[in-house]
From Swiss-Prot:
GO terms for molecular function: DNA binding; nucleic acid binding. Its main location: cytoplasm. Disulfide bonds: none annotated. Residues 7-67 form the CSD domain. InterPro entries: Cold_shock_CspA, Cold_shock_domain, CSD, CSD_CS, CSP_DNA-bd, NA-bd_OB-fold. This is Cold shock-like protein CspA. It holds the Pfam family CSD. It comes from Vibrio cholerae serotype O1 (strain ATCC 39315 / El Tor Inaba N16961). Keywords: Activator, Cytoplasm, DNA-binding, Transcription, Transcription regulation.
Length: 70
């Protein structure tokens, strides 16, 4: 199981359903897709929002999974 990490949403495009998270540990920004957001109803994130997540290897590099608002 991947380690839970924390960070802040750098930006998220609701129309396209994706964005990036800045990691608290200073690592590279992580891609996030709306399907990875753990919530009910419309899945979106706000710029600057604090989140926890795991990192998985996606088709084009690191990708956030199990994204939960803090």
């Amino acid at each position: 199981m991947s380690q839970k990490m924390t960070g802040s949403v750098k930006w998220f495009n609701e129309t396209k359903g994706f964005g990036f998270i800045s990691q608290d540990n200073g690592g590279q920004d992580v891609f996030v897709h709306f399907k990875s957001i753990v919530s009910e109803g419309f899945k979106t994130l706000a710029e600057g929002q604090r989140v926890s997540f795991t990192v998985e290897q996606g088709k084009k590099g690191p990708q956030a999974a199990q994204v939960t608002a803090l």
